[in-house]
């Protein structure tokens, strides 16, 4: 495993203080990491752990790291040590081997040290092309530990659409990387795979996690050398990526020229012309959304019927058993098309309406594609063929109406079927249903009768309850 050392920090930039406002922090973290890995001065014990039929090489536990921080940095409170460990992990210097969320836990969770090549002090600014190569490479290796997470699969589909014209080049680069990796020792390959994954967890974090590579705009303005060098992680050389994957130590820091100033002025003028919403409009939209959903928030509006887990009212169970949607539920379907698609009962009602108009194939196709994304990999190809034959093939029994562009793209995708083969077709059908079928459903007697029936039922129940109270 590639371990950190003082000499290995030489892969950084020429003058740290001139290159990144965060370099002082990186240097301090790297000093801690170097000492943590130094066996001679009492570093953290790095060991290989046996796990059932396999071995997990070069790992440390979260407890060992926390205890080392408390002992060597004179930290008395374990919470403070865990917080410091989480900050170091968030920068990618330490990472959990089985989780995409970079945080520190004071337990037996296994962690691994990042290779110095991937340290943030190297001022990485990886391109989307590199990310596409990485994700594509992961899909080529049939290993459980390398399976894409849901958000990674979505990112891959988005990148595949964005780089459609040069996807063949990306695929070839990924294949070349896989061939190189296969020549490496099994243990070394396992370690490098995890380090590479941790690198991308820092630069393309899990949705909901903070991106620690983003820099404060005020710090950026204070830089004497604002030219950020873009580097390819895999050494890809293109017009947009001609830089070496590592900065050269001897590279001098050049002075700002007139051309640099002109480029900066052009960039700032472009920023001025960008379309930005006024804060008043944003606040107005947020208030409208809050007012619309306030009655569905149990923290603000008491739920009706009340929660049976915290009260003696069991009416909720009766409603669920009856399979009849409440008035609130029916009303919510009218908020947006996504609301009715999220609700199982709403989808069933919408499907019945479409069947009555002999146009249910659009919704059935959309649901089939959603189900395809959740299928096991071994069943995907078969399911893709079934969907094609049912909805898109010439003479299909439930043919859907696609524009020529979407149909052509889908026809090409079917030749090499995957979970996202019908992405363009699904998006087209979604927009079609949202603009046409959904609007007609809200105006239909089926929806209006359902909504009025719930209101009428509620008013009759209220009158019945009032009568019982008066008689008693």
Swiss-Prot record:
List the Gene Ontology MF annotations in alphabetical order: GTPase activator activity; GTPase activity
Pfam families xrefs: DEP, G-gamma, RGS, RGS_DHEX
* Main localization, broad class: cytoplasm
Give the protein name, as stated in the record. Answer: Regulator of G-protein signaling 6
Subunit info here reads:
Interacts with GNB5. Interacts with RGS7BP, leading to regulate the subcellular location of the heterodimer formed with GNB5. Interacts with GNAI1.
What role is this protein assigned?
Regulates G protein-coupled receptor signaling cascades. Inhibits signal transduction by increasing the GTPase activity of G protein alpha subunits, thereby driving them into their inactive GDP-bound form. The RGS6/GNB5 dimer enhances GNAO1 GTPase activity.
> Which terms does the UniProt entry file under GO BP?
G protein-coupled receptor signaling pathway; intracellular signal transduction; negative regulation of signal transduction; positive regulation of GTPase activity; regulation of G protein-coupled receptor signaling pathway
Task: Tell me the ranges covered by the DEP domain, including all copies.
Answer: 40-115
Q: Does the keyword Nucleus apply?
A: yes
What are the protein's UniProt keywords? Cell membrane, Cytoplasm, GTPase activation, Membrane, Nucleus, Signal transduction inhibitor
User: How is it placed in the membrane, per its record?
Assistant: Peripheral membrane protein
| Domain RGS residues, every copy | 336-441
Subcellular location per UniProt equals:
Cytoplasm; Cytoplasm, Cytosol; Membrane; Nucleus
The domain comment in this protein's record states: The RGS domain interacts avidly with Galpha and mediates the acceleration of Galpha-mediated GTP hydrolysis.
InterPro entries in the cross-refs: DEP_dom, G-protein_gamma-like_dom, GGL_sf, RGS, RGS6/7/9/11, RGS6/7/9/11_DHEX_sf, RGS6_RGS, RGS_DHEX
Q: Which GO terms describe its cellular component?
A: cytoplasm; cytosol; membrane; neuron projection; nucleus; plasma membrane
Domain (G protein gamma): residue spans on this chain: 261-330
Q: Which SMART domains match?
A: DEP, G_gamma, GGL, RGS
């Amino acid at each position: 495993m590639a371990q950190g050392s003082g000499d290995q920090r030489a892969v950084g930039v020429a003058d740290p203080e001139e290159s990144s406002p965060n370099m002082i922090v990186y240097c301090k973290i790297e000093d801690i990491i170097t000492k943590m890995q130094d066996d001679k001065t009492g570093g953290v014990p790095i060991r290989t752990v046996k796990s059932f039929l396999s071995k997990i090489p070069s790992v440390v536990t979260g407890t060992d790291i926390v205890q080392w921080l408390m002992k060597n940095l004179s930290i008395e409170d374990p919470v403070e040590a865990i917080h410091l460990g989480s900050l170091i992990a968030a920068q990618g210097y330490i990472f959990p081997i089985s989780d995409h969320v970079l945080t520190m836990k004071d337990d037996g969770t296994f962690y691994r040290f990042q290779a110095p090549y991937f340290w943030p002090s190297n001022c990485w600014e990886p391109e989307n092309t590199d990310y596409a190569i990485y994700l594509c490479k992961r899909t080529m290796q049939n290993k459980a530990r390398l399976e894409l997470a849901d958000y990674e699969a979505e990112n891959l589909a988005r990148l595949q659409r964005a780089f459609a014209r040069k996807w063949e080049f990306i695929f070839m680069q990924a294949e070349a990387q896989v061939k190189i990796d296969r020549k490496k020792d099994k243990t070394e390959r396992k370690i490098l795979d995890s380090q590479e994954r941790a690198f991308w967890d820092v630069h393309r974090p899990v949705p909901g996690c903070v991106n620690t590579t983003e820099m404060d705009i005020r710090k950026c303005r204070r830089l004497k050398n604002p030219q950020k060098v873009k580097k390819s992680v895999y050494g890809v050389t293109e017009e947009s990526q001609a830089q070496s994957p590592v900065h050269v130590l001897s590279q001098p820091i050049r002075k700002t020229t007139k051309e640099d100033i002109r480029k900066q002025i052009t960039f700032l003028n472009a920023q001025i012309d960008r379309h930005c919403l006024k804060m008043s409009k944003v606040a107005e939209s947020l208030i409208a959304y809050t007012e619309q959903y306030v009655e569905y928030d149990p923290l603000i509006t008491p739920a009706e019927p009340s929660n049976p887990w915290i009260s003696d009212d069991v009416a909720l169970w009766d409603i669920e058993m009856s399979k009849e949607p409440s008035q609130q539920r029916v009303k919510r379907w009218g908020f947006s098309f996504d609301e009715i698609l999220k609700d199982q009962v709403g989808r069933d009602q919408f499907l019945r309406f479409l069947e009555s108009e002999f146009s249910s194939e659009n919704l059935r196709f959309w649901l089939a594609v959603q189900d395809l994304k959740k299928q096991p990999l071994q069943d995907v190809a078969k399911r893709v063929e079934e969907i094609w034959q049912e909805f898109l093939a010439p003479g299909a029994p439930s043919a859907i109406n696609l524009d020529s562009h979407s149909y052509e793209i889908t026809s090409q995708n079917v030749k090499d079927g995957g979970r996202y083969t019908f992405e363009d077709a699904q998006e087209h059908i979604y927009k079609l249903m949202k603009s046409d079928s959904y609007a007609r459903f809200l105006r239909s007697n089926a929806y209006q009768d359902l909504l009025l029936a719930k209101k009428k039922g509620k008013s009759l129940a209220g009158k019945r309850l009032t009568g019982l109270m008066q008689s008693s």
